[in-house]
């Protein structure tokens, strides 16, 4: 399994936000940027990707604090979200005077904003006093908002009386070579790379690969020299109405998640209030977890009407999930 650390930034009844660290590839990721004062300053300085659900204050107030810690550091930070996130970021940045920036290391924010089936790409560069520069427009495909060779982030547009985004980050299963066996083969470095490419492509199943003076079948090499590194899927859902359409969209997005971070704002007895303010109840959160067949549920964004008594939410979730193997933490 990839080496991924992930955890909530705040208490369950405080601002939403999840931090995710993929140290071996140098990615430090935020999902939402509300109050982030509890996050270690050294980690905030490393953050290079931010996925924002929407820009209500409790999901966006921490941008200024992050900006303050980024100044003096040369870095590119990628930000993803739904319209009007680029406008919101622009106005945040223009709330300050940027003279003397010629003496500052270059900090750049690259914003990818979703709107009506398209992504709008913008650049904000401290050397240009964070002027809003439109870069390009691209067609959104396959519900993917970000992808690299290691993982991808899918999204869904959900209803919170405004459009908001839900996210799911997924590392696929990976074919790995058994190093101890590979070392025994008469193969040079580039030849090992060719072998891996050969085995990663299932279209080669009827072909053979030459090692030394002998040819081996695809199946034989696959069974003897490889193993599968299990991937991981981590999803983040908050600030959504518990409507049939939302629940269906969320279920598709977070299907088979290893970890589902999902709001659980109200007890079921307060379902009328939940509908009024477009949030989920414990019953709806549990329903999503069951329908999506998730392994672990991490609930958050508990209503402050229950004070610090988080057990009220946890106990009710446990009741709704008692007939499942889903772990609540």
Question: Could you tell me what each predicted segment is?
Answer:
Residues 1-45, 49, 76, 167-169, ...:
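Conserved beta-strand hairpin/beta-sheet module of binuclear metal-dependent hydrolase folds
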Residues 31-33, 48-58, 81-82, 235-240, ...:
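Active-site neighborhood of phospho(di)ester-bond hydrolases with catalytic His/Asp-centered motifs
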Residues 35-82, 101:
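Active-site metal-binding motif and surrounding structural segment of the metallo-beta-lactamase
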Residues 63-69, 92, 97, 307-316:
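Metal-dependent catalytic neighborhoods of phosphoester/phosphodiester hydrolases
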Residues 121-236, 240-245, 252, 259:
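Active-site-proximal loop/helix segment associated with metal-binding centers of metalloenzymes
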């Amino acid at each position: 399994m990839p080496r991924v650390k992930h955890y909530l930034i705040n208490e369950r009844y405080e601002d939403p936000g999840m931090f995710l660290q993929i140290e071996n590839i140098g990615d430090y990721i935020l999902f939402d940027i509300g109050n982030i004062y509890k996050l270690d300053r050294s980690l905030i300085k490393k953050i290079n990707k931010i996925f924002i659900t929407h820009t209500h204050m409790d999901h966006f107030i921490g941008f200024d604090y992050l900006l303050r810690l980024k100044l003096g550091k040369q870095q590119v930070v990628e930000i993803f979200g739904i319209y009007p996130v680029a406008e919101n970021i622009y106005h945040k940045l223009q709330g300050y005077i940027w003279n003397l920036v010629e003496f500052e290391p270059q900090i750049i924010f690259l914003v990818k904003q979703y709107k009506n089936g398209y992504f709008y790409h913008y650049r904000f560069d401290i050397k240009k006093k964070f002027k809003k520069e439109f870069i390009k427009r691209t067609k959104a495909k396959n519900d993917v908002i970000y992808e690299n060779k290691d993982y991808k982030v899918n999204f869904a547009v959900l209803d919170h009386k405004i459009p908001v985004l839900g996210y799911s980050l997924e590392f696929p299963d990976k074919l790995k070579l058994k190093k101890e066996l590979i070392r025994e083969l008469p193969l040079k470095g580039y030849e090992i790379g060719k072998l891996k490419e050969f085995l990663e492509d299932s279209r080669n199943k009827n072909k053979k690969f030459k090692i030394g003076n002998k040819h081996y079948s695809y199946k034989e090499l696959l069974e003897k020299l490889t193993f599968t590194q299990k991937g991981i899927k981590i999803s983040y859902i908050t600030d959504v109405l518990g409507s049939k359409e939302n629940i269906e969209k969320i279920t598709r997005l977070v299907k088979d998640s290893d970890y589902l971070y999902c709001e659980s704002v109200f007890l079921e007895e307060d379902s009328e209030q939940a509908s009024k303010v477009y949030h989920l109840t414990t019953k709806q959160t549990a329903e999503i977890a069951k329908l999506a067949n998730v392994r672990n549920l991490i609930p958050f964004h508990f209503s402050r009407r229950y004070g610090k008594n988080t057990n009220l939410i946890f106990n009710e979730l446990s009741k709704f999930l008692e007939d499942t193997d889903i772990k609540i933490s």
